[in-house]
């Protein structure tokens, strides 16, 4: 009897597999970290083979833990770190270069050239994005220009490009299917989010051959079947979405005005704007939230590059903690008279500043500043950055008074009550943490299960969303104002170090 859906959650630092039952409860979870490579300042790479082997290993482990076989699994759903770029040989499957990760800033010069040549208005109008190293298009161009012979081979159709979902799908199907979904395509700088097609003008500007690009499908569709020797029998692959869009689905943010924020390596807030794309006046992105039955639902997005990775820095870079769960209790012991601010621009700054060149800084240090104050500043930096996104979304959304009065949160950092309470305090709004916090994986599972007939239509699925805890604002208005002013001053100081105020 088909009773489960398998979600592949391929993230920045680890690959995970989560088996969901038909009632969306979790049957098993498996996780495997893989190495990060930092060959130069601002460069971040992954070995595609590490992504692949860790994905297969976790799928097998989750199935073994739950005691299920392929005949028990209705479908596989894939969600993935977005923008991360893989280029591989169509015939052999060999990657031409390590995967260039979404955090990577090596293409800042390419982006500067595109802006200088006046291309940004056309790119932004069609893609809803800005010209920034974050997105896949300039990463593809860099690989083609940097690997000897790659550009000529790509023009002949010998090379394929894919975001991580596309690469995994190609491997899972034994090289039979080269496809992606609309959410991942919308993050490449090559896809017109209004027409739902790869755009010839954008391909020409970025110098990317059309032959490299995958077919673009709905987020819930039959993409193909896994080859039998991977799991013992074929399993249908029926759902794909980028990780942040999958979280929108998993959080059941199906109504315009609903907003979710996911806290993993980075932080990403998305506001559902319905069937109409809203052009941001406050340096947010306009993107596709999901595509079902050929109909696109759009979102405003704010992207923060450093959230959970600030806690990793406390652990791995400074040695202040041994595990992430220690951070909240440590921060709680900080000296309340100190005002230490961390601006964690380790790889530049994302929304709403968009400056790839600045680097992080600490402000307000005294002789008495210690581990507790640094932990406090690291956690609080995530809340301040979320506030910046929140304020920009309120300004952009045409009915701000009726929109996103509650923030739905998910991701690893939401386990910290300290951080979630501080987030509610600084936003001056309730923060809702759901019972099922694996919302990214749940979104992928839902998209796959919807196509397979396991899960109901979105409105009925939304009825199953359950609140675990609501964090209510408790900070005084005076304290909130003082702290936000201090954060704004710290950000100005960092931006001034590059001689500007962002893009």
UniProtKB/Swiss-Prot annotation:
Inhibited by fructose 1,6-bisphosphate (FBP). Pfam families: FGGY_C (PF02782), FGGY_N (PF00370). GO terms for cellular component: cytosol. GO terms for molecular function: ATP binding; glycerol kinase activity. Transmembrane segments: none annotated. One of its GO terms (biological process) is glycerol catabolic process. Key enzyme in the regulation of glycerol uptake and metabolism. Catalyzes the phosphorylation of glycerol to yield sn-glycerol 3-phosphate. ADP binds at residues 12, 16, 265, 308, 412. Glycerol binds at residues 82-83, 134, 243-244. This is Glycerol kinase. It catalyses: glycerol + ATP = sn-glycerol 3-phosphate + ADP + H(+). Belongs to the FGGY kinase family. It comes from Nitrobacter hamburgensis (strain DSM 10229 / NCIMB 13809 / X14). The keyword Repeat does not apply.
